[in-house]
Design a protein with these regions (language model features):
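Terminal leader/tail segments of proteins
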Residues: 1-98
């Protein structure tokens, strides 16, 4: 297993967040809120098998979801933000994450 860190960053305002890997729910939590001082709402740590996966993040209360294919070995940390009405998933944008 390979550790995967998902940093829920900008735009969360008391949301319920659901995270699935390859169609299997791995995380569900309500009340996720971005702490503006640090630009982070929650750090989620999961273990995944090596190889390619599909990450799906949904905000049921906002009726939106985002999806991204990633490689567990080359992308051990991903950032998730809710920006301009959509979920953005990508590499961390703040220095010092690695």
């Amino acid at each position: 297993m390979i550790p995967l860190t998902l940093d829920l960053q900008e735009g969360f305002e008391g949301d319920q967040v659901v995270i699935a890997i390859d169609g299997h729910e791995q995380f569900r939590k309500s009340g996720i809120r971005t702490r503006l001082q640090i630009g982070l709402a929650e750090r989620v740590r999961l273990d995944v098998e090596p190889g390619q996966h599909i990450l799906n993040v949904s905000l049921p209360g906002r009726n939106t979801q985002g999806e991204r294919r990633f490689d567990a070995a080359s992308e051990p940390i991903l950032a998730v933000s809710f920006v301009e009405g959509r979920i953005d998933i990508g590499p961390p944008r703040a220095p010092g994450y690695l």
